[in-house]
């Protein structure tokens, strides 16, 4: 703290120490004044309360004596009796008009749902029953679906599924119709009447030629003079030989899998 003792902002400076002491003394005085005011306010409030209590206690005997001395006064004291007696001479309005006005106001409040009696439901408070309590109209024109129902039907996923199923059934029906037509076509081409002699003779000659060619091929194969049969080119990629650029005859051929025999 001995660093720069000549500065005005130094903590241990005489002027600063005196200023702090003055501030502390002023704060103590303000706190004492605040406490004195609080005590004075509490004292005044207590004094006022006791005065009112004493005044009320002094009024009770005088009021009881006045009630006992008043002739024919057995009920409570009415302070506004004179004003009521003076107001008897005042002319009153039309009772019928006031009643009609009150009924009109009550009817409007009931229509708006503002006025309801105890134990009365919301449906009873309305002048017209709600739509769900109205009976269905018999023989009238059927009203179309509302906007909410149309939106619900359009967004219904079940309706979308049924539409796609209908398209699928229609497509399968069309394909089935084509197949039945194709199957029925040969039946239409079949002659209805018995074959003629020329047709029978042509069929017989065709069969004999086929048998003769088969027999000649068998004899040529047995005698060794048959020409080598050309093997048909395999079209299925899974049954063809593996590709070999230099020795295609040595390429391994995949094993042929026969289809399973049905029992």
Swiss-Prot record:
Superkingdom of the source species: Eukaryota
Region annotated Disordered, chain positions: 16-37, 88-263
InterPro entries the UniProt entry points to: CIR_N_dom, LENG1-like
Coiled-coil residue windows: 16-46, 89-116
Residues that bear Phosphoserine: 244
Basic and acidic residues composition-biased segments: 88-110, 147-163, 179-190, 200-215
Keywords: Coiled coil, Phosphoprotein
Cross-referenced PANTHER family: LEUKOCYTE RECEPTOR CLUSTER LRC MEMBER 1 (PTHR22093), LEUKOCYTE RECEPTOR CLUSTER MEMBER 1 (PTHR22093:SF0)
Protein name from the UniProt record: Leukocyte receptor cluster member 1 homolog
Organism: Bos taurus (Bovine)
């Amino acid at each position: 703290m001995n660093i720069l003792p000549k500065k005005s902002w130094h903590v241990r400076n005489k002027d600063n120490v005196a200023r702090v002491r003055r501030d502390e003394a002023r704060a103590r005085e303000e706190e004492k004044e605040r406490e004195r005011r609080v005590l004075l306010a509490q004292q005044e409030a207590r004094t006022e309360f006791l005065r009112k209590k004493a005044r009320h206690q002094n009024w009770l005997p005088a009021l009881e004596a006045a009630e006992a001395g008043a002739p024919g006064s057995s009920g409570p004291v009415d302070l506004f009796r004179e004003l009521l007696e003076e107001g008897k001479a005042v002319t009153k309005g039309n009772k019928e008009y006031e009643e009609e006005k009150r009924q009109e106001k009550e009817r409007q409040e009931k229509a708006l749902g503002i006025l309801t009696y105890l134990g009365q439901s919301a449906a009873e408070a309305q002048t017209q029953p709600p739509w769900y309590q109205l009976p269905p109209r018999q023989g009238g024109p059927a009203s179309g679906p509302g906007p909410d129902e149309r939106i619900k039907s359009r967004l219904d996923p079940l309706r979308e599924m049924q539409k796609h199923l209908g398209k699928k059934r229609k497509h399968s029906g069309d394909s089935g119709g084509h197949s039945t037509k194709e199957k029925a076509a040969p039946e239409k081409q079949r002659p209805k009447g018995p074959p003629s002699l020329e047709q029978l003779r042509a069929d017989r000659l065709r069969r004999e030629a086929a048998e003769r060619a088969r027999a000649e091929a068998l004899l040529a194969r047995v005698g060794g003079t048959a020409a080598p049969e050309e093997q048909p080119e395999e079209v299925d990629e899974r049954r063809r030989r593996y590709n070999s650029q230099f020795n295609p005859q040595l390429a391994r051929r995949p094993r042929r899998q026969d289809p399973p025999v049905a029992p």
